[in-house]
Amino acid sequence: MSDVSPPSSLRVFPDTGALLSMLIFPRDRLGNPTLAGEVLDLYQQGAFALIISRAVVDELEEVIDRDFVAYRSQVIGLLAPRANQFTRWPTPEEIAATLPFTTAPEDAPIFAATVVAQSDIVLSNDFRAFHTPQAKLFWAGHQIALESLYGLLCVLGRRQRKPATDPSP
C-alpha cells in the first residue's frame, strides 16, 4: 500500500473486511489479482482516495490477532506509515445514532466512522450488515454510496454491472 495520496477526489471508505481482503488477499493462489487486489491496484494508481478510520484499524487488529496472526507484522507495516491520516473514532452520540440502521451493534462504530470520514463510497462485501434495507436507508440519508468490491470496480470502469434478471415466469 502506497502512502502517497492519490489526486482523485473520490473518497472510498473500506470496512474491516474489505480492508483485510485488500491487505492480506490481493492475489489468489495462482498469483492473479482478486477483486480486492484489483481495487488495491486502482488505489495505488490514484483512481480514488482510500479513507481509513481508526475504528476500522482497531477492529482489523482484533481480527488479525484472532484469525490471521501470521500476517500481523505485514498488516501493521502497511498501515503504520498512514497512521496520522486515519480518521477519528466516532463519538458515543454518533455511534448511537446509527443503531436503528444496523443489524448488529458491533457494526455501529464503523457506520458512524463512515459518516465522520465524509466518505463518498463505503466499500463492503458484508451483505448481512452493510447491504440490508435499513443500512441502505442510512447510507442514502448521508449521501454515501454503498459498493461491494465488484461494484467499486464497476464504478471505476473495470467491470460492468450485470443486468437485473426478471423474476417473473
Predicted segments, located by residue:
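Short amphipathic alpha-helices and their capping/turn segments at secondary-structure boundaries
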Residues: 1-7, 72-73, 78, 111, ...
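Short secondary-structure boundary segments
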Residues: 16, 54, 125-127
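Short, active-site-adjacent cap segments at secondary-structure transitions
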Residues: 19-20, 57-59, 129-131
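PIN-domain endoribonuclease scaffold, especially VapC-family toxins
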Residues: 39-97
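Active-site neighborhoods of divalent-metal-dependent phosphate/nucleic-acid chemistry enzymes
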Residues: 84-123, 127, 131
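Acidic, PIN/NYN-like endoribonuclease modules and their adjacent C-terminal/linker elements
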Residues: 121, 127-169
